[in-house]
């Protein structure tokens, strides 16, 4: 007659001591073979329950994403029509990462990087790593090497549509190359996602839209590079220009809407709107006014805006001018809005737009 194995308390549950011993032996063997951290209990505190993020440079979009920005250790896809603000948004993420002391890189497959524009958005050009690869294979190999180094905080690939497979480059004009790019992306992402997760890198793929032929019902729009990027992305952002901004007859920017169409780290399908000004990027002042009104920090009556008992001015442009010239007032309003949005306050520098 044999006695039952004694029970051991583990996380409030009784576990068979013999099973626990076998489990510990298995874990030790796995860590010896594959390294420390190969397998861990979620309750150990080292399993990464908290999602770390890098700000997008937009308070509204950070709020819509649910974790305060783009998640580290994940793949993000930013897509939309031409001139919708895709690269602008990615450059703002780079600028925010650099403010925190992060190392950033851009793989410019389009060979169209504008350093003067990036500088206007707050990017430190001298600290930015840039590569202009000749083929899609070279571009993705560069991304893999940067990610596996564990030293890079943000890698931007601009864009997926420009990742031309080597076989297509070596072929003649008019040669069929159907499926080559999709296979390239699928193979690369299978290798990249694990490395990205371990390195805590924000990996951004900028993508373009194409029209599917012969679609009678539903949206004819699709992104380039096959379905792999849609599958492996933890966050997908659909960015669109919804209105033009004018100062008299002069076009000064565009009203932009971003929809979080996929989000594995928070509830999806939330939206954010902000102004993108030509030559300046996301308007922090305009966004603060909009969010202030939305959360009741700033009162709006007709075209007049007020803060508490103080009248700020008539029209958004006059209020922007007042906030630009009064950093203390800017900070007060920003802290109140931030507190209402996320439950905590954070001091940031006043913008100089």
Swiss-Prot record:
CDD domains: RecA (cd00983)
Keywords tagged on the record: ATP-binding, Cytoplasm, DNA damage, DNA recombination, DNA repair, DNA-binding, Nucleotide-binding, SOS response
Cellular compartment(s): Cytoplasm
GO molecular function: ATP binding; ATP hydrolysis activity; ATP-dependent DNA damage sensor activity; damaged DNA binding; single-stranded DNA binding
Gene Ontology cellular-component terms listed: cytosol
Biological process, per Gene Ontology: DNA recombination; DNA repair; SOS response
Residue spans crossing the bilayer: none
Chain residues that bind ATP: 80-87
Family annotation (Pfam families): RecA, RecA_C
Bridged cysteine pairs (disulfide): none
HAMAP family in the record: RecA
Function: Can catalyze the hydrolysis of ATP in the presence of single-stranded DNA, the ATP-dependent uptake of single-stranded DNA by duplex DNA, and the ATP-dependent hybridization of homologous single-stranded DNAs. It interacts with LexA causing its activation and leading to its autocatalytic cleavage.
Family named by the database record: Belongs to the RecA family.
Designated name of the protein: Protein RecA
Source organism of the structure: Chlorobium chlorochromatii (strain CaD3)
Taxonomy of the source species: Bacteria, Pseudomonadati, Chlorobiota, Chlorobiia, Chlorobiales
Gene symbol of the encoding locus: recA
């Amino acid at each position: 007659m044999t006695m039952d194995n004694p029970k051991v308390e583990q996380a409030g549950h009784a576990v068979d001591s013999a099973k626990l011993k076998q489990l510990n032996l298995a874990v030790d063997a796995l860590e010896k073979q594959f390294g420390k951290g190969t397998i861990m209990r979620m309750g150990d505190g080292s399993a990464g329950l908290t999602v770390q993020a890098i700000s997008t440079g937009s308070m509204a979009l950070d709020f819509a994403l649910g974790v305060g920005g783009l998640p580290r250790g994940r793949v993000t896809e930013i897509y939309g029509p031409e001139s919708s603000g895709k690269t602008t948004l990615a450059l703002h993420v780079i600028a925010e990462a650099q403010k925190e002391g992060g190392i950033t890189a851009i793989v410019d497959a389009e060979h169209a990087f504008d350093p003067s524009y990036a500088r206007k958005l707050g990017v430190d050009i001298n600290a930015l790593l840039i590569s202009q690869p000749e083929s899609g294979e070279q571009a993705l190999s560069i991304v893999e090497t940067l990610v596996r180094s564990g030293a890079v905080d943000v890698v931007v690939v601009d864009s997926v549509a420009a990742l031309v497979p080597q076989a297509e480059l070596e072929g003649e004009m008019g040669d069929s190359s159907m499926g080559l790019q999709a296979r390239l992306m699928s193979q690369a992402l299978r290798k990249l996602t694990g490395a990205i997760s371990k390195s805590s890198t924000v990996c951004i793929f900028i993508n373009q839209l194409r029209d599917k032929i012969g679609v009678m019902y539903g949206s004819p729009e699709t992104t380039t590079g096959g379905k792999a990027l849609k599958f492996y992305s933890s966050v997908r952002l659909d960015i669109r220009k919804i209105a033009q901004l004018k100062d008299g007859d002069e076009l000064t920017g565009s009203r932009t809407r971003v929809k979080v169409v996929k989000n594995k780290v928070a509830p999806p399908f939330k939206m954010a709107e902000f102004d993108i000004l030509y030559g300046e990027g996301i308007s922090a002042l305009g966004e603060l006014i909009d969010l202030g009104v939305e959360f009741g920090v700033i009162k709006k009556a007709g075209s007049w805006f007020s803060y508490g008992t103080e009248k700020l001015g008539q029209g958004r442009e006059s209020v922007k001018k007042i906030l630009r010239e009064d950093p203390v007032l800017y900070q007060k309003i920003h802290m109140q809005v931030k507190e209402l949005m996320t439950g905590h306050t954070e001091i940031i520098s006043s913008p100089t737009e």
